[in-house]
Amino acid sequence: MPLKLDVSRAEGIAIVKCRGRIVFGEETDDLRRTVLGLLKETKRIVLNLALVPHIDSCGLGTLVASFISARNREAEIKFAALSPKARRVLGITKVDQLFEVYESTEEAIQSFHPRPKAAVR
């Protein structure tokens, strides 16, 4: 299944819904180009991986490279709704400790809006 990337925006945040495998070839090239293009427009991106059935080593490298590209531009990429297989790959490789991972896109969006601290009396 080729990778399809649906980009939307909410609250100034780019949301990329990935559908299909993130594997060596056009898939990783498309994802890399999409993320780099979005980083020219915004400092906040959420990658939704709910519909990603497989990530190979090149796909994993692309996710890490995208994360680093964002960080180098003082931007943030957060991950949301990982499919069971995506969660497994990120967990086995310990990459999930590098990324901020949220159960849903909504939670990832909210994480960009820190709650005000309570007043101290």
Where are these regions (language model features)?
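General small-molecule cofactor/ligand-binding pocket signal
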Residues: D6-S8, A80, Y102
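A charged, well-structured terminal subsegment
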Residues: V101-R121
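Residues that form or immediately flank small-molecule/cofactor binding pockets and catalytic motifs
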Residues: G12, P84, E106
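Intrinsic disorder/low-complexity segments
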Residues: I15, R87, A119-V120
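STAS-typified acidic loop motif
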Residues: K4-R33
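Amphipathic alpha-helical interaction surfaces in cytosolic regulatory modules
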Residues: V23-F99
